[in-house]
């Protein structure tokens, strides 16, 4: 996959969550909620400030990030379902 997001946009692949509940019930695809964690695959050059300077993004490729269930725009690229979102739609970075 070769995609380069512009400015303060980020490309994220959702991390699929377990399809079995804690009590052992298997959830069908329609009953699952969209995952709210994902891996950053690509980042833009940064946010353009009012004075013309470019502010680098806080997230980097490989980061695991948290975001809202309906954040970003879903796109299909080479069979992969990815999200393109602005950095300000990301709530935080999961640190290991």
From Swiss-Prot:
Chief place where the protein resides: cytoplasm
InterPro entries xrefs: Chaperonin_GroES (IPR020818), Chaperonin_GroES_sf (IPR037124), Chaprnonin_Cpn10_CS (IPR018369), GroES-like_sf (IPR011032)
Keywords of the record: Chaperone, Cytoplasm
GO molecular function terms listed in the Swiss-Prot or TrEMBL record: ATP binding; metal ion binding; protein folding chaperone; protein-folding chaperone binding; unfolded protein binding
PROSITE patterns to which the protein is assigned, alphabetical: CHAPERONINS_CPN10
SUPFAM superfamilies linked to this entry: GroES-like
Record text on subunit structure and interactions: Heptamer of 7 subunits arranged in a ring. Interacts with the chaperonin GroEL.
UniProt cross-references to HAMAP family, sorted A to Z: CH10
Protein's job: Together with the chaperonin GroEL, plays an essential role in assisting protein folding. The GroEL-GroES system forms a nano-cage that allows encapsulation of the non-native substrate proteins and provides a physical environment optimized to promote and accelerate protein folding. GroES binds to the apical surface of the GroEL ring, thereby capping the opening of the GroEL channel.
Full protein name: Co-chaperonin GroES
Organism this protein belongs to: Marinomonas sp. (strain MWYL1)
Gene that specifies this protein: groES
